[in-house]
Amino acid sequence: EITCRDWSSDVCSSDLVEEGVAERFVEGRAAGKQILGFSDLSEFVASLNRPRIIMMMVRAGNAVDELIDQVSPFLAEGDVLIDGGNSDYMDTGRRVAACRARGLLFVGAGVSGGAEGALRGASIMPGGAKEAWPLIRPLLQDMAAKAADGTPCCDWMGPDGAGHFVKMVHNGIEYGDMQLIAETYFLLKRAGGIDNERMSRLFGRWNEGRLKSYLVEITSDILAYKEADGGYLVDRILDVAGQKGTGQWSVKNALELGESFGLIAEAVFQRNISTQKELRVEAARVYASRLEKEPYASFSADEVEQTLFASKLVAYAQGFDLLSRASEQFGWNLDLAMIARMWRGGCIIRSAFLDELARAYEAGGGRGNLMLFPAFSTQVREALPAWRRVVATAVCEGVAVPAFASALNYFHSLTTDFLPANLIQAQRDYFGAHTFERTDGERGKFYHEEWVSLQ
């Protein structure tokens, strides 16, 4: 079920998975709307005006290809197919070319918003056959959420699989953001001794400032939620986090494109280790009497807020750097400022600071690492002492904060003008003759040393 508002256009729905779903939908939630339901695919296609626009909401993978093959015989040249699932961007690029050969226009549209977005409007990231954009723009922008200034959270991303790539990076940032919030909760609880009620109020207060976001807002709600017997539900949820794969895809693509993506990789790895519940319980038992906490300096809630904000900036810096690298690699010409604006509403990572991020990219010519933008570098400098203090405290307390630590180490590496990679390159040349550049030579000129002969 997707957004069912009072559209000016007619809508036809068809379900090929479970018989009767379309009928129940039309008679239920869609009652009174301009929506027709069909169980026969040929009748469904025949009911649409040309050029036909069909949006497919199916599981990523073979199901998309199968549906394309099923519906294509009933379509005509110039008809549009939109894949609104979480497809791999490489698959989308392949489908764009295959559909073009059939005379069809294929669009891969990343959609973020969850169940709420399905009813109230989502952030929609379309890409693929550019000729389809004038045809589908009114429909998708009507379906999309609207930012506070009324701008639809939907615009054209680029050719091939650009739309699904942007959605994949969105999900990677989402993984990072959620892990940072979880570590904040864990640190406040384990090292700070703050109960759920106080923590809920704290997140609620943060949601009134620069951390204002959907994820911070719902965290406040979750921490305050009690069951009928007065117990907090969050304390009764098993500490095992699931995932659907887009976070892993983003890390894999960052590796392939040579981008630093450590914070988001740690977020994925933490979900992985969370599933090893029995192993963790056994390890906790084995080491319980041996893990001694060191004396530590206390931290304030304000210092934790600074740590969360600075680390959040790193998550976005890594995500947008990956978008920038992909744009250059694939010739997509992604508009990073526009992407930031498009994520201001509907999507899971919507947050107040995206307006500032969009303005920073516009001022910076649309490229650059956001950690270097004046709008954010001043805030990072101010947060740095607290950031270091909070991470050090967590280490001394034995509280796992891998995303916070990764973010801080990324910052330290980014701001170090000479890293120990010179030794790594020397080792590579020693055992594999992989050559090296010299500090007293030209960039791009490589040397090899016969290390053994010098001994």
Feature-to-residue mapping (PLM):
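Small-residue-rich helix-loop
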Residues: 205-206, 328-362
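Interdomain hinge/lid region at the active-site interface
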Residues: 164, 189, 194-197, 201, ...
